[in-house]
Structure formats: C-alpha cells, structure tokens
C-alpha cells in the first residue's frame, strides 16, 4: 500500500517541505475569492462565504452502528482527495514574497479523524440541530465533518476556497463510492483497497498554471484592456441597482445568523416549467433569474431614488476552458468559478427574453474587443481580477444606493454529478442512498443568495439571508412572489 501521506501525484507548482507537507501559492481565482472574504463585514472568528454542505443519507439497516464506517469513509475521502485536508488562509503561511499559500500536510490518519470528524450527539454536540449548523460559519484549519445520528445527516463545513458547488457535488460521488466500498469490504481493508471513481489521488496545479496565464509583468494588449473596460462598465452601471429595504436600523448592524427559505417544484410542475421555457426559447435558470429581477423591480426605491438598473452577477464555470485531463474525478475539488457582471439598463420589460439571451451565450465570451469579437477569459482574467478588486474595494460610493443585488447560483440537475443510490447492482435494496442535499453559503451582509438545483425530480429554489438585515415575515412573501412570477410568465398560473 502507498503511504497515506505520500501517495498522491503532485502537479507542477507544489513544493515539498522537510516535514513532508506540500505548498503552493494561491492561484488567481483563489486570491480573487480571498479578497472578497477579507472585504466582508464579519466579526472576529467568523468567515464570509463559508460553505455548509448537508448530505441526508439512508444507510444499511443491518448495520447497528454506522459511525465507524462513516469515519473510515471520511478517511478514504482524505486519502483520494488530498485537497479536502488542505489548509488555507488565515491558517496557512505566506512565502518570502508575501504571497498567500495553500498547504497540504502529510496525512496522519488518526490525527485527521480526531480533528475533523465529530459525532453531533449528547455532550459532544456542537450544534443544536442540522439547521443550526448552517447559521454561523466559524473557520477551521481544515474541512470538518459532523454526523447527526437522529436525522442520518452528514454535514461538511469548509472555507469556500477549498471547493465550489460543482466541485463538492462531483466529490460527493467519490465519497459515496468510498462509503459503499467500506460497507462492502469492511473496516480493516487497506485504504488503497477501497474503490472510488478516483484513479490516482492527485494534487492539481493552480488555475494560473492550467490556463497558462502570462507573468504579471507581461504587457496587456489594447484589445484586452478594452474588453476589461467593457466588463467594468457593467459594474459601474450596477452601482445604481435596485435593492430590497432592510429592517429598520440595521444598515450598520453586525451580521447575525444565516437563515433560509425554500420553495419546491414537484416533478409535474417542473416538467411544465421546462416545457414553458422551451416554448420561449430560454433556459430555466434565465426564467428564474428574470422572476427574481422582476420582483426586485416591483419594490419602490423610496430612500434611493437614483436606483434604476439591476446588476446580474453571472457565475462562469471555468471547467470548460480546462484541458480534459484536469476535469476528472481525481481533480474534482478546487475553485473553478468566476463572477461575470452583466447590468440590465433601460427598464425591465421583456426580462425573460433579455436574460435568456445572456444565459444562452458562453459566459466566457461576454466581453468583447472594439471590433465586437469575443475575448477569452484566458486573456482578460489577470487584468480583470485586479480591476474588479480595486472597484469592489472602493465601495460604498457616495451618492449611490447600497450595493446589495441578489445572486443566483444555478446548479442544474445534480444527478449529472452524483447518484441517488450506491450499492451492488442487482441487489434488492441499495447499500446506501442520498435522500437530500443542501449547500449553505454563509451570508454576512444584506446580499440575498438564491440557489437553484434539481434532485430526485424536484426543483428547489433556496433563498439565503442574514437575519440581522431581514425577517422571515418580510422575505417569505418575496419568495412567494418570485415563484408566482415564474409560473405566470410561463403561462402556468400562480403557486
């Protein structure tokens, strides 16, 4: 068996220390997200953008105590996906030039389990219940797993720097295959005997290396500068975006708890929504986003009469830009997203069609040069990242409305990444099954986060908010308005 701490294939860019740990500088995308986290208004001991991943499981009934199997599966997960054990800022160090580092320590199986796997029960309980686990995100040096026996739910909590939503859903498939293998082979098999979809545990290089970004001192072509200027214009127009009123007296309040609302669309309703979107020639994501904007535009901007536009932060998945060898289960974890701004100006008529046109384009081709030709992310990201950081660091801008536009993360059908059940083919019942999933992104300001995905034939639209700035009594009708707007726009009536 390969040594648990020295088994991974290490890509270029990593440096091995005397103690066996591996380090590399944060890449461009990680630095971009870290800057956002550091700009957030968070009290000491809390972190913006922290992720709480909820995995509700149905496990074999003939296993009296599943905890040893879950612990073993968590260890297998660390073995095949080393980045789950990576240490990011503020817990990692900087190099001699001041660059932030990500560090993957040598794996000590017992220490890994002692520090990162906990059973939330009795006197050892850290959280009151599963919902409580997503309310406040307190950073830890490594990813943490909490098992809730009463609800058969596994909670994974991590800084967003370690993975994005697509990454954790892809890696869930790896974890579940490992868990099924542990049930099948027992607790005493060597780590490399358990089977997952990972061919070889590996540490990927940073995005800078994969995408071949030029050195920082490389001159930027004029056409790229003009394309970045175009993207920045969307941000500047977005300064005059509409917003929802926050609760009275909360404008300068410290963040409290992340809460959520959810509306479900059952299978028949989802089929009707998909058919309605096809008839209009738009994606479901575009139709939902249009409904959110339509509801925001219906609120009077009494305190900020200059608000007239709506910024649409579009999440661009960078994976299609990567060489296929990097888009495999071995490299599922990591940060491969970026936010592209698009600002709606000139009124809010024909929203579904206008947003449908935006969503139908390759997000990486939204910026264009003076001739109207698209400019690839490969060319503009280094310059755009620094320009965007400078802009966001200048907020708030005097005379402009508060900058709190709603975000939508649309993840599609999760069965693209994971299965509903894992077990031996032909068995009467699966070994283990995923009953439900949810991913909470910690909100620490008045920004409202929407998350859209479909699993087990049901589409879920989550709304995440911080209760320092909004109440459930206010937002529950807003959520219902978004639902009704979507159904009415597609000719399906309300609710």
From Swiss-Prot:
Q: Does the keyword Phosphoprotein apply?
A: no
Enumerate the subcellular locations listed in this protein's record, separating them with semicolons: Nucleus
Q: Which UniProt keywords apply?
A: Alkaloid metabolism, Nucleus, Transcription, Transcription regulation
Superkingdom: Eukaryota
Q: What is this protein's expression induced by?
A: Expression is induced in loline alkaloid-producing cultures as well as in planta.
Query: Transcription regulation: is it a keyword of this entry?
Result: yes
SUPFAM superfamilies xref list: CoA-dependent acyltransferases (SSF52777)
Please provide the Gene Ontology terms (biological process) for this protein.
alkaloid metabolic process
Q: What cellular component GO annotations does this protein have? A: nucleus
InterPro entries (UniProt xref): CAT-like_dom_sf (IPR023213)
Described purpose of this protein according to its UniProt entry: Transcriptional regulator that may regulate the expression of the loline biosynthesis cluster 1, one of the 2 clusters involved in the biosynthesis of loline alkaloids, potent insecticidal agents composed of a pyrrolizidine ring system and an uncommon ether bridge linking carbons 2 and 7.
Could you identify this protein by its name?
A: Loline biosynthesis cluster 1 transcription factor lolU1
The organism of origin for this protein: Epichloe uncinata
This protein's encoding gene:
lolU1
């Amino acid at each position: 068996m390969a040594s648990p701490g020295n088994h991974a294939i290490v890509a270029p860019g990593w440096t091995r220390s005397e103690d066996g740990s591996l380090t590399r500088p944060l890449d461009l995308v990680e630095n971009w997200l870290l800057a956002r986290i550091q700009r957030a208004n968070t009290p000491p001991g809390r972190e913006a953008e922290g992720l709480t991943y909820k995995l509700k499981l149905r496990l074999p009934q003939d296993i009296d105590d599943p905890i040893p199997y879950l612990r073993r599966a968590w260890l297998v997960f660390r073995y095949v996906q080393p980045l789950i054990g990576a240490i990011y800022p503020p817990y990692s160090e900087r190099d001699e030039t001041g660059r932030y580092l990500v560090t993957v320590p040598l794996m000590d199986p017992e220490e890994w389990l002692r520090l990162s796997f906990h059973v939330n029960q009795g006197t050892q309980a850290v959280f009151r219940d599963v919902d409580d686990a997503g309310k406040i995100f307190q950073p830890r040096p490594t990813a943490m797993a909490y098992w809730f026996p009463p609800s058969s739910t596994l909670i994974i909590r991590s800084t967003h720097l370690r993975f994005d939503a697509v990454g954790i859903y892809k890696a869930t498939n790896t974890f579940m295959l490992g868990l099924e293998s542990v049930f099948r082979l027992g607790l005493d098999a060597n780590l490399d005997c358990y089977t997952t979809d990972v061919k070889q545990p590996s540490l990927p290089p940073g995005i800078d290396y994969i995408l071949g970004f030029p050195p920082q001192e490389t001159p930027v072509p004029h056409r790229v500068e003009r394309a970045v200027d175009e993207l920045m214009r969307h941000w500047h127009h977005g300064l005059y975006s509409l917003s929802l009123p926050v609760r009275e007296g909360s404008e300068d309040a410290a963040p409290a708890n992340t809460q959520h609302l959810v509306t479900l669309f059952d299978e028949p309703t989802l089929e009707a929504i998909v058919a309605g979107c096809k008839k209009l020639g738009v994606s479901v994501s575009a139709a939902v986003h249009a409904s959110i904007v339509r509801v925001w535009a219906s609120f009077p901007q009494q305190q900020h009469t200059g608000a007239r536009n709506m910024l649409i932060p579009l999440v661009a998945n960078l994976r299609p830009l990567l060489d296929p060898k990097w888009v495999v289960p071995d490299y599922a974890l990591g940060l491969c997203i970026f936010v592209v701004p698009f600002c709606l100006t000139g009124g809010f008529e024909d929203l579904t069609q206008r947003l449908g046109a935006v969503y139908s384009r390759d997000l990486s081709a939204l910026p264009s040069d003076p001739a109207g030709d698209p400019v690839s992310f490969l060319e503009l990201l280094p310059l755009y990242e620094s320009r965007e950081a400078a802009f966001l660091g200048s907020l708030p801008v005097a005379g402009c409305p508060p900058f709190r536009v709603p975000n939508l993360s649309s993840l599609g059908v999760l069965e693209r990444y994971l299965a509903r059940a894992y077990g031996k083919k032909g068995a009467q019942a699966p070994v283990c099954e995923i009953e439900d999933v949810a991913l909470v992104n910690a909100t620490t300001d008045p920004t409202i986060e929407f998350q859209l995905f479909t699993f087990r034939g049901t589409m879920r639209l989550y709304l995440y908010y911080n209760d320092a700035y909004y109440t459930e009594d206010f937002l529950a009708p807003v959520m219902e308005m978004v639902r009704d707007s979507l159904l009415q726009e597609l000719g399906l009536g309300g609710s």
